[in-house]
Amino acid sequence: MTLVQHVVTIKSTYWVIPWELASYDNPNLFTAMILMSPLVNADAVSKLNLLAAKLMGTITLNAPVGKLCPESVSRDMDKVYKYQYDPLINHEKIKAGFASQVLKATNKVRKIISKINTPRLSYSREQTIRLAMF
């Protein structure tokens, strides 16, 4: 089974569970994880904005709430330029429902990430690549 087939199988079986939580609840489903891109830095957002995002995410699911800053995609300005002008990328604002679900999943993952025993390779812009084997 290829990785893509495995992900499709997991997503079709556990479609309501973010894959990070599926790994925690069902550690036998994954042999390893590669985590790319940092989690949303909730500390940089005011408590009022977080509350508003949660409220909007439950009341007005399709309300536009914010855009991804292209400079956060890469440090390489050539890649940022390509991202900005790629016609296949949706550059519209993020919907409140999606943002709310990402915040919920992020908070859950932050609480349990140290308890996940699956080997993982983590990479983020702020850190060097590190391999966590538990």
From Swiss-Prot:
Name the UniProt record assigns to this protein: Protein K5
The similarity comment for this entry is: Belongs to the poxviridae K5 protein family.
InterPro entries attached to this UniProt entry: AB_hydrolase_fold, Hydrolase_4
Q: Which organism is it from?
A: Vaccinia virus (strain Western Reserve)
Gene3D superfamilies per the record? alpha/beta hydrolase
Pfam families of this UniProt entry? Hydrolase_4
Annotated S-S bridges? none
